[in-house]
């Protein structure tokens, strides 16, 4: 089960305690609906000086178009509403089409920034720089959210799964809930003789990419697949975070990987030192050890080190969603709107964001993010 997490603000304190090593990001809604976050409809392009107020906003109005990860849709909804309040006449249109599509359309100059659960691939770095007028594209992890192993198993409220169990389930080597390997992880539990229905993301997804990185790192390479496209040999696909979550709710015996805010019931995971419940404390313990591959304003999380954590009471299956932005090269209006929106997002790392299952950033990492936003030119 997910206790004291999905609807709690207590995690804010955990992040404050671990802020010396944290950066945030998140993801969002179902791509099939192509929903957008539109918190205001006035697309006037004048500058609203009064909106700048005490928040150091430019007050530039218009529609800011962004696209990408479905995992952060709920966060974008919230940030977009706050943005419209802070800058009357401005609105965010966030298309939750998945990380892959977001990066593609950012590079294609169809979106001002991309939401992605994975950093740019090596062969995307130069095209992104070209899109930015020859300037570097930065990764700004603005939203962090744990990934849950969501399941639908009647009568089993507390389910323990080892990393090996997960690898074997998603490879199709374990096909029944009363398999001896699962029973061994759940002593005394009455597991039903019921088929396991694997549900995976059918769209190109940063969540899939990170989940596969986790499976590989945590199992010493037993999981061999990688990338944003999840293997389709086992189970059935669904589009977006909402899609996989709804499929699990509808299908008895189903299992999937999805952001915690979308999961009603989540398994405890044994990362190597006993089952670990997904809650604010265990996630905070993992965030204490978060490291970065890069310095300066381009903030790429070292996912390999994160996913290899196996400490007791530590839940390292955490999704960091990047807002991929141009460090420079925007036209003046777009630059100012991007900076205003990201500033509002940083000002909105609060209890309401936590209530949606995300982890608000604070302390040193929030400061580092704010410095990066201010440096966009």
What role is predicted for each listed range?
Residues 58-59, 106-108, 132-134, 140-143, ...:
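Extracellular/periplasmic catalytic domains that process cell-envelope and extracellular macromolecules
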Residues 27, 34, 38, 48-183, ...:
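N-terminal segment of the mature folded domain
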Residues 103, 204-293:
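Ligand-binding pocket segment of bilobal, Venus flytrap-like solute-binding proteins
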Residues 2, 27, 50, 54-58, ...:
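Extracellular/periplasmic juxtamembrane helices and adjacent flexible linkers that interface
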Residues 2-12:
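Bacterial N-terminal signal peptides that target proteins for export
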Residues 20-24:
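C-terminal motif of bacterial Sec signal peptides marking the signal peptidase cleavage site
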């Amino acid at each position: 089960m997910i206790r004291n997490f999905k609807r709690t603000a207590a995690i804010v304190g955990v992040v404050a305690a671990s802020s010396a090593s944290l950066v945030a990001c998140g993801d969002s809604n179902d791509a099939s609906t192509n929903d957008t976050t539109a918190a205001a409809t006035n697309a006037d392009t004048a500058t609203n000086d009064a909106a700048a107020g005490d928040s150091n906003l430019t007050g530039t109005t218009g529609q800011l178009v962004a696209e990408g990860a479905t995992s952060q849709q709920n966060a974008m909804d919230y940030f977009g509403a706050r943005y419209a309040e802070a800058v009357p006449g401005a609105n965010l249109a966030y298309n939750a089409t998945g990380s892959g599509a977001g990066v593609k359309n950012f590079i294609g100059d169809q979106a001002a920034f991309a939401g992605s659960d994975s950093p740019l691939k090596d062969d995307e770095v130069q095209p992104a720089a070209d899109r930015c007028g020859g300037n570097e594209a930065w990764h700004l992890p603005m939203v962090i959210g744990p990934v849950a192993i969501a399941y639908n198993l009647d009568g089993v409220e507390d389910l323990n799964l080892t990393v090996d169990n997960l690898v074997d389930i998603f490879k199709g080597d374990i096909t029944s809930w009363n398999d001896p390997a699962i029973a061994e992880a759940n002593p005394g539990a009455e597991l039903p003789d019921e088929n396991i229905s694997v549900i995976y993301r059918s769209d190109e997804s940063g969540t899939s990419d990170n989940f596969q990185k986790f499976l590989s790192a945590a199992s010493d390479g037993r999981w061999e697949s990688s990338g944003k496209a999840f293997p389709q040999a086992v189970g059935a696909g669904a589009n977006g975070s909402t899609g996989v979550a709804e499929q699990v709710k509808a299908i008895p015996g189903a299992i999937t990987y999805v952001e915690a805010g979308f999961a009603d019931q989540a398994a405890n995971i044994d990362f190597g030192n006993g089952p670990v419940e997904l809650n604010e404390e265990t996630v905070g313990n993992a965030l204490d050890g978060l490291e970065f591959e890069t310095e300066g304003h381009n903030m790429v999380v070292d996912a390999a080190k994160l996913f290899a954590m196996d400490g007791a009471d530590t839940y390292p299956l955490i999704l960091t969603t990047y807002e991929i932005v141009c460090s420079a090269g925007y036209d003046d209006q777009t630059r100012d709107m991007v900076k205003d929106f990201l500033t509002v997002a940083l000002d909105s790392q609060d209890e309401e964001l936590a209530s949606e299952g995300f982890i608000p950033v604070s302390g040193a990492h929030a400061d580092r993010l704010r410095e990066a936003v201010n440096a966009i030119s």
